[in-house]
Design a protein with these regions (language model features):
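Non-catalytic alpha-helical scaffolds and adjoining flexible linkers that form interface surfaces
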Residues: 1-21, 26-234
């Protein structure tokens, strides 16, 4: 029997049978994989927390038939600081949804995994405003990493289908406020320093625009509104 070992983050879980659970893990070396955890729901509480959502661990597993079976798990970080802070949990929940939508099973995305791991630790240390801007920069990186680029030839409208910010108005474009254009046009230049970043509402507007862009071009279903419990208007 060949055992496989990798670091990974639990991004989804589904109870299965009387005591089993299937966990979806975004792994460093193998992309997104589903692991069958036998008898975990009948095990002691500590073991259950090791396969809970948003737990970073080293996983050892093997393949049996069409399934990957978890053999051992060594927790690295439970991210309690994220789970116990509602605003940080909102942002983290959205990150998990991005992973679930963007990454296909078995698709190896080591650099993306490393960015996600850094992002989770970044969220712990920073305020909501800076964290929203970090999400925006991550989405910009995703767009570029998937081979797309938003061309800027104006500043009044965002044309999702044409991947451009333009001054030409038609039925396909989205009007841009001046503050929103400033964020979108300088996203790669701005550092993550809170006193240089726009207010939260503008950042959310920018994220939603990127979300619409990614959903259109990558056929995903990102939806920030589902993850905001704090009552932000968007």
């Amino acid at each position: 029997m060949k055992f496989i070992r990798t670091k990974g983050l639990v991004i989804k879980k589904v109870d299965f049978g009387e005591g089993d659970r299937i966990i979806t893990v975004f792994s460093e070396n193998f992309g997104k994989i589903d692991l069958l955890v036998k008898g975990i729901r009948k095990s002691k509480k500590r073991d259950q927390s090791s396969v809970d959502l948003l737990t970073l661990s080293n996983f050892t597993f093997y393949k049996k038939g069409d399934n990957f079976i978890l053999n051992t798990i060594d927790p690295i970080d439970f991210f309690y600081d994220l789970k116990n802070d509602i605003e940080k949990l909102e942002i983290t929940s959205y990150i998990l949804s991005i992973i679930n939508e963007i990454i296909f099973p078995g698709e190896r995305k080591k650099e993306f995994f490393q960015r996600i791991e850094k992002a989770l630790n970044f969220i712990i240390k920073n305020n909501t405003q800076v964290n929203f801007f970090m999400i925006l920069k991550m989405m910009n990186w995703i767009v570029k990493n998937e081979g797309y680029r938003i061309n800027i030839s104006g500043e009044k409208y965002f044309n999702i289908a044409e991947s451009s910010i333009t001054d030409f108005d038609d039925e396909k474009v989205i009007p841009l406020k001046k503050e929103l254009f400033e964020i979108l046009s300088n996203i790669e230049k701005k550092a993550l320093i809170s006193n240089e970043i726009a207010n939260i509402e503008i950042l959310i507007d920018a994220i939603i625009l990127y979300e619409k862009y990614i959903n259109y071009h990558l056929d995903t279903k990102l939806n920030l509104k589902k993850h905001l419990f704090g009552g932000y208007s968007c």
